[in-house]
Amino acid sequence: MYPLRSKVTTVGRQASGARALWRATGSKESDFGKPIVAIANSFTQFVPGHVHLKNVGDIVADAVREAGGVPKEFNTIAVDDGIAMGHSGMLYSLPSREIISDSIEYMVNAHTADALVCISNCDKITPGMLNAALRLNIPTIFVSGGPMEAGKAVVVDGVAHAPTDLITAITASASDAVSDEGLTRVEESACPTCGSCSGMFTANSMNCLTEALGLALPGNGTTLATHSARRDLFEQAGRTIVDLCRRYYGEEDDAVLPRSIATKEAFSNAMALDMAMGGSTNTILHTLAAAQEGEVDFTLEDINEISYRVPCLSKVAPNGTYHIEDVHRAGGIPAILGELRRAGHLNLKVHTALYDNAEEWLDDWDIRGGKATEAALELFHAAPGGVRTTEPFSQSNRWDELDTDAANGCIHDAERAFSSDGGLVVLRGNLAPNGAIVKAAGVEEELWTFTGPARVVESQEEAVSIILKKEVQPGDVIVIRYEGPAGGPGMQEMLHPTSFLKGSGLGKACALITDGRFSGGTSGLSIGHISPEAAHGGLIGLVENGDPITINIRERQLTLDVDEEVLERRRATEEQREKPWTPKERNRPVTKALRAYANMATSADRGAVRVVDGYVN
């Protein structure tokens, strides 16, 4: 039997002071000696994906208590990337991932909690909590707030928008063809309920990947925030974490620990899922970071190999017209994993927090496999309510029938894949010797090869300005540099430039490349994560207006077509500047908090994690 971590604060004479304080929080004599379960909630009124989580911690806590544990809840910060988008607020988004990880480590270790329930949902919160779970390596279960319902169809200025979402609204705002009145109609329809934004954007992608890793319950990635079935997941999470405590502390079963579950094979499966569902490019950034926290040897090269062999089986917004509620109706994450299993693209030598082996897990939950349980069939019938609300669990609508059409439905089988390659592709070349990422699932195939002159800017704001001023020409390659993890700092998302390009009618006529990153809502020929970034001496820092740039997704190449001698002269000139490898003209205040992140941040090929040197243990 392993001793409870919390024993140091609950047992013996020396723990008397700590016990006195525990009693002041509501703990009783009978609680001492039971596992203390930390519930990391992320409720905030700033974020629709988290606005409904205020009382959810109580649901989990009640289940923990009934199962024999002692629940103690605390909160993390949560940044809404959509509200922070397009202005200096976006500088704080990616660094907030590290703050979330650190804050959970601080709370759990300072109070010697025995286990952890992560109530996450949106863009940086799930990755931040995942990093913390792998860092702490105590029994952990994830349960997210759930996705938002898709917006209702609207007809604006004679053009149908069906169904709507956040990206519909942002794109419409840049279109001269949409009136102010029409824009308001789109805006009012786009985000109708609480929950993470309704497409296969970063938040939903990461919640789906956490399910595939085995650290979340089946259905976690796709069950709507508004549906009563989501409440069942929270209750089950509370019961499950106490059982994991029993197995680990009582039976010395190390298999239930996060690092035993999230192995290299599990990371490979999660990334295979990502390729199959065309997830956000941010998932690569966060997966690389999580692997490092868990000391798993999983790199960009592994992701590149998976991308070559795993087909794209689904095109969900922004890559198509389906939304997460449609993925759920088609069987959710187990259905996609089931298709990969049948095609031989899944490693079955893994287990989950609930199941000892992958075969049993997928047999029970893959509705297309022929062995699914009644619980699985019931769960995936959960449908949207179609009513504007910020209340969770507020409806119990059901689909009349499930979508099991592997040829024309939301999830295809491997024989009828959208493409033989994965939805995310790693590019290399002299512009990105350490890699760059493109969401191939969101790029029209006629744009997979593209050559054009560079139009260089040194901030997202400048990019937005030249697009809205119509200074960008068809065929241009917009280069946004010094927006990487260190150069930004904070590696801003470029959703506004890509959305405004689309809204201006240039979405299929231009390319955009950056050492920054993109929102999960981005589609089109948008290449991010260029490594090394400009601030670290990357070649993107030497590009000049008019330089020809060639993109070849099929050949996985990103090339600056300029003679090496010319580039060496430019590099020598850059090195002689008073402040080399910094923007020449950019007025951007950088706070102490952001400087701290910038001084430790690695480039995107390493997950933009911090490297802390100089500490001697």
From Swiss-Prot:
One of its GO terms (cellular component) is cytosol. It comes from Corynebacterium aurimucosum (strain ATCC 700975 / DSM 44827 / CIP 107346 / CN-1) (Corynebacterium nigricans). Keywords: 2Fe-2S, Amino-acid biosynthesis, Branched-chain amino acid biosynthesis, Iron, Iron-sulfur, Lyase, Magnesium, Metal-binding. Its cofactor is [2Fe-2S] cluster; Mg(2+). PANTHER family: D-XYLONATE DEHYDRATASE, D-XYLONATE DEHYDRATASE YAGF-RELATED. The gene is ilvD. GO terms for biological process: isoleucine biosynthetic process; L-valine biosynthetic process. It catalyses: (2R)-2,3-dihydroxy-3-methylbutanoate = 3-methyl-2-oxobutanoate + H2O; (2R,3R)-2,3-dihydroxy-3-methylpentanoate = (S)-3-methyl-2-oxopentanoate + H2O. Binds 1 [2Fe-2S] cluster per subunit. This cluster acts as a Lewis acid cofactor. Functions in the biosynthesis of branched-chain amino acids. Catalyzes the dehydration of (2R,3R)-2,3-dihydroxy-3-methylpentanoate (2,3-dihydroxy-3-methylvalerate) into 2-oxo-3-methylpentanoate (2-oxo-3-methylvalerate) and of (2R)-2,3-dihydroxy-3-methylbutanoate (2,3-dihydroxyisovalerate) into 2-oxo-3-methylbutanoate (2-oxoisovalerate), the penultimate precursor to L-isoleucine and L-valine, respectively. Belongs to the IlvD/Edd family. InterPro entries: Dihydro-acid_dehy_C (IPR042096), DihydroxyA_deHydtase (IPR004404), DiOHA_6PGluconate_deHydtase_CS (IPR020558), ILV_EDD_C (IPR056740), ILV_EDD_N (IPR000581), IlvD/EDD_N (IPR037237). The modification N6-carboxylysine is found at K124. This is Dihydroxy-acid dehydratase. GO terms for molecular function: 2 iron, 2 sulfur cluster binding; dihydroxy-acid dehydratase activity; magnesium ion binding. It is an enzyme of class 4 (lyase). The active site is at S519 (proton acceptor). [2Fe-2S] cluster binds at C122, C197. Pathway: Amino-acid biosynthesis; L-isoleucine biosynthesis; L-isoleucine from 2-oxobutanoate: step 3/4; Amino-acid biosynthesis; L-valine biosynthesis; L-valine from pyruvate: step 3/4. Gene3D superfamilies: IlvD/EDD C-terminal domain-like. Homodimer. Mg(2+) binds at D81, D123, K124, E493.
